[in-house]
Regions:
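Short acidic (Asp/Glu) patches
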Residues: 80-84, 120-122
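Double-stranded beta-helix
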Residues: 104-124
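Short acidic-glycine-tyrosine-enriched beta hairpin
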Residues: 67-82
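A cytosolic small-molecule/anion-sensing beta-strand core signal
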Residues: 57, 73-74, 92
Length: 152
C-alpha cells in the first residue's frame, strides 16, 4: 500500500529533526556517511525547501522519486527538487556524494545569473559520461571545502 503524501516525513537532512546544521545554505557529504547509518537505505521522504543532487560515482543505487524506481549502475547525477518524495537503496560499495542546496541559495544564484536554473526545477537523472573525472574532482573539492569550513 502506498503511503499518503501527508504521512511522508519532511526533513531538513534525512533522519535529523534539528534545524539546518550549518550557517551556509549548502551541505555536502559522502553517500556512505549517512546511508551506512541507515543500513544503506534512505526511506521515502521529502524536503520543504531544499534541492538535492545525488552523485553516484560507482556502486549501485535504487533511486525512487515520486514512486518511480530506477536502478543506477553507472556514474549519474540525480536531481531532486523541493517537496519531491524520494528514497534510495544503496549497495555497500557505493561511492558518491549528496549536495544539498537551500532554496534561498538557488534563488540567489538564479538572480545573479539572470535566469532560472531549469535543471533544478524538475527531477531528472543525468549519466555523467565523459565529464566523470571533472565531476569527481569538483565534488571532492566541495566536500573538502565544506568539511573544512564546518570544523572551523
Amino acid at each position: 500500500m502506498k503511503a499518503s503524501r501527508s504521512s511522508i516525513p519532511v526533513f531538513k537532512l534525512y533522519g535529523e529533526n534539528q534545524a539546518w546544521p550549518t550557517p551556509d545554505l549548502l551541505h555536502c557529504e559522502s553517500i556512505p556517511k549517512r546511508s551506512s547509518l541507515h543500513h544503506w537505505e534512505i526511506k521515502p521522504h521529502r524536503h520543504a525547501d531544499l534541492y538535492q543532487l545525488l552523485y553516484v560515482q560507482s556502486g549501485q543505487a535504487l533511486v525512487e522519486v515520486e514512486g518511480r524506481r530506477e536502478d543506477v549502475r553507472e556514474a549519474t547525477i540525480q536531481v531532486v527538487p523541493p517537496l519531491m518524495v524520494h528514497g534510495f537503496q544503496f549497495s555497500e560499495n557505493i561511492e558518491g556524494y549528496v549536495l544539498t542546496l537551500g532554496a534561498p541559495l538557488v534563488a540567489q544564484l538564479e538572480s545573479q545569473l539572470g535566469a532560472p536554473l531549469a535543471v533544478l526545477a524538475a527531477a531528472g537523472r543525468y549519466p555523467v559520461g565523459r565529464d566523470r573525472q571533472r565531476l569527481n574532482s569538483l565534488f571532492k573539492t566541495l566536500l573538502e571545502e565544506y568539511e573544512g569550513s564546518a570544523s572551523a
